Amino acid sequence: MIINIEKTVSNAFHHKHPVDCRVFYEKNQYGMSAAKFDRFVQSKGLSSIDGQWKEISYAEARSIFIDLCSRSLCYGTEVMPTSKADFLASQFFKYFNKQESKYFTNFILDSYPSMINIYKLHNYASCHSLLPTSLLSIGILSVNTEEIGLFVRGEWD
C-alpha cells in the first residue's frame, strides 16, 4: 500500500539523517493546471510554491523518485540500496501511472541531466521547499483527471 512506501523510506533514514517522507493521495478536484496544485499541497499542510511546478516525463519522475529514496539530499551518500528504491518507485507508480497521467516536480531546473544526482542539485537547480520545517524538500506530483498523488521527502541536515 501507499503508506508502506512512506514508512519504508522514513525507516531507512531513521538513524542516519533527520528526514520527513510523506505520500498524499485524493480524488482530483483541482484540474490539470499546475497553478492549482498548490491548493492540494496546502490542504495537506505543506507549503505553497506559488504554482512553480515543472512538468517532467514519467522517466524523469521515476528517476527522481529513486534518487530521493536512495540518496541523502544533503550529502549525496547512499542511504538505501537502489534496488529497494526501484521497488518503492514501482509501488508508487503502480498507483499513479495511468495513460493520461502527467508528472510535476518542485525543481526549477537550469539544466536537467539524464540521471539526476541529488547531491549536485545545487549545481543544476534551485528548489521551492514543500515541507515548512525542512531545509530541503523535493516532491513528485502525479496527476490525471481522476486522482492526484504526491511523494515528498525532506531533510534538515
What are these regions (language model features)?
Residues 1-105:
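Long, contiguous N-terminal structural blocks used for assembly/anchoring
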Residues 94-157:
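Acidic, proline/glycine-rich low-complexity IDRs
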